[in-house]
């Protein structure tokens, strides 16, 4: 629940978010809001996301209202590809939470860390509800900033024994290898085709605009969490793979327009009705995986309600701990 403004504007910085919100808190918040969305108790507003034709940046807004949790707000931010050269994260964002009873700005929360951990929580929720319980090999496609968050969150969902990984820049793979070693998991850098042959669960977390995985490379029973496609034109996997899989998503409206399903839907090979909100599985309204041979795919487009959910948790914990700043507007 968003804090009230009677004591001024609450400000929770990036450092506090990292101290207060862990993987368990993020998982619970994201799973809860996905369930609320499927019940119709929470909804996202239309996304605004634009190439601003400056610094090669993408900038936009994601917002929504969770009536069940009484969380109202907006995340503002985007992607600046040159930031890492200046020691900054390429992803930059801030979350604004409003008092739903009055409309007053209540809380300002740093969104960079929370974006990474809520994205990882989303794929983790999909793994928990859709992957085979006997999954042993985790495949990672992408080794950027968010990849280590993804690996840590995924590793908590199944008894994985090995991580296989591919990245277009193989010199970045050691960051994943270090985390795998820390978690006691065998690590192997492989080709894309070999990754598909070995992995029981695959996470794609890239900014690709062409398929990195082809349908014929994926073995029966695999669960894929496609987490990088959040803009029109982006694509991480072959559209034929999307068509052959049982597809779940965070938000169907986004999946078919800016998500991994956009290409299959755009060609007429997949209908909107064939895509299921993962909240329906969480709520027990859909069985999820139907067999050990079924290929399941989670199209994680990233919705504003995820950001608001984890930001609300950060605000509550910071207020309880007395570690947030308060200012009067």
Question: What does each of the following model-derived ranges do?
Answer:
Residues 1-115, 124, 134, 305-308, ...:
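N-terminal ligand-binding/catalytic initiation module
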Residues 185-269:
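Rossmann-like adenosine-cofactor binding region
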Residues 14-17, 235-329:
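Adenosine-phosphate binding glycine-rich loop
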Residues 144, 168-169, 230:
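Residues in the short beta-alpha loop(s) of Rossmann-like NAD(P)-binding domains
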Residues 118-138, 145-157:
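Short internal alpha-helix immediately C-terminal to a glycine-rich phosphate-binding loop
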Residues 134-136, 161, 222:
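Nucleotide donor/acceptor-binding cores
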Residues 138-139, 296:
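Conserved beta-strand elements of the Class I
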Residues 156-183:
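NAD(P)-binding Rossmann-fold cofactor-contacting core
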């Amino acid at each position: 629940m968003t804090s009230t403004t009677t004591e001024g504007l609450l400000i929770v910085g990036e450092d506090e978010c990292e101290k207060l919100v862990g993987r368990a808190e993020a998982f619970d918040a994201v799973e809860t809001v996905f369930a609320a969305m499927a019940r119709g108790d929470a909804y996202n507003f239309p996304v605004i996301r634009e190439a601003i034709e400056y610094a090669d940046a993408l900038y936009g807004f994601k917002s929504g209202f969770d009536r069940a949790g009484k969380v109202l707000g907006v995340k503002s931010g985007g992607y600046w590809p040159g930031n890492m050269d200046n020691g900054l994260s390429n992803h930059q964002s801030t979350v604004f939470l409003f008092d739903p009873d009055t409309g007053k700005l209540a809380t300002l929360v740093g969104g960079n860390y929370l974006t990474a951990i809520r994205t990882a929580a989303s794929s983790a929720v999909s793994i928990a509800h859709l992957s085979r319980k006997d999954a042993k090999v985790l495949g990672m496609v992408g080794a950027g900033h968010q990849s280590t968050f993804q690996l840590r969150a995924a590793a908590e969902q199944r008894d994985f024994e090995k991580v296989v990984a591919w990245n277009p820049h193989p010199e970045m793979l050691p960051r994943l290898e270090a985390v795998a070693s820390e978690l006691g998991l065998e690590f192997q850098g492989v080709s894309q085709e070999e990754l598909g042959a070995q992995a029981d669960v695959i996470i794609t977390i890239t900014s690709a605009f062409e398929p990195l995985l082809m349908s014929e490379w994926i073995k029966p029973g695999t669960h894929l969490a496609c987490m990088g496609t959040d803009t029109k034109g982006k694509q991480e996997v072959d559209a034929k793979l999307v068509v052959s899989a049982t597809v779940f998503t965070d938000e169907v409206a986004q999946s078919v327009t800016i998500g991994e399903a956009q290409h299959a839907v755009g060609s007429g090979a997949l209908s909107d009705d064939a895509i299921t909100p993962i909240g329906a599985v969480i709520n027990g309204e859909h069985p999820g995986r139907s067999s050990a041979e079924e290929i399941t795919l989670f199209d994680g487009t990233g919705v504003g309600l995820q950001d608001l959910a984890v930001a609300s948790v950060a605000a509550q914990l910071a207020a309880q701990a007395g570690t947030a700043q308060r200012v009067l507007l």
